């Protein structure tokens, strides 16, 4: 039963991942996410339903458009598989792990699972938009803040309303202070305004500790990823989007934050 639930979660997640690909591609361009139907960006070929099956269609089409044979970006199946894996991980970590007897519904853990899925979904979309466009959309940041506050009003959210509000303030003010000092000292932005809003959104879901976790883990991951580029191009400056790293840091804290807190305070 557990394997079946995880498999269903993966399939459902990959379907949402296909939708996320539409959001990632169209929203920064100001295009409608409803119309027109998905088309090949090279030749305009209208993608048929059987050519739009998450992950599998990419494999069957061998990564090429069926009409013009131009390559389809590997990013599409990556987003679909990543989202499927994330959905399955959330279902296991926040529900199955606490409720191995799946015949009994636990409302508290269902709410936590839904919150984790929605939170991560926002981060996935924002991360890939940031990678492509070096921007983080206000609609997701502000919408995420509202969503985090709404979950905190329930007795089953990750944090209570007080912690959520403190997380928003802390996630917005501390990074802004870092941004301001860096701008004054280096005469350049070390942190984007979109990153600050993203951290406020992270704080709405997970409070102050999740903001700190996102900043710490995000900085470490970002540094490790950036080192090869820095070593190869010592005299050149590159802008590396920080949103994906903050998102990874927040996800790590969401899954392992309680363990880390116990280690730190015992």
Predicted features and spans:
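Hydrophobic alpha-helical transmembrane segments
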Residues: 1-15, 87, 149-156, 249-266
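Hydrophobic, lipid-facing residues on alpha-helical transmembrane segments of integral membrane proteins
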Residues: 11, 15, 19, 78-89, ...
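Membrane-proximal soluble regions of multi-pass membrane proteins
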Residues: 20-75
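C-terminal ends of transmembrane helices
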Residues: 21-27, 62-70, 123-135, 177-188, ...
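Long, charge-rich boundary regions
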Residues: 61, 66-143, 147
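Transmembrane alpha-helix boundary signature
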Residues: 90-105, 155-164, 258-262
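Functional transmembrane core segments of multi-pass inner-membrane proteins
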Residues: 107-108, 113-221, 263-266
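Interfacial loop-to-transmembrane junctions
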Residues: 193-194, 228-252
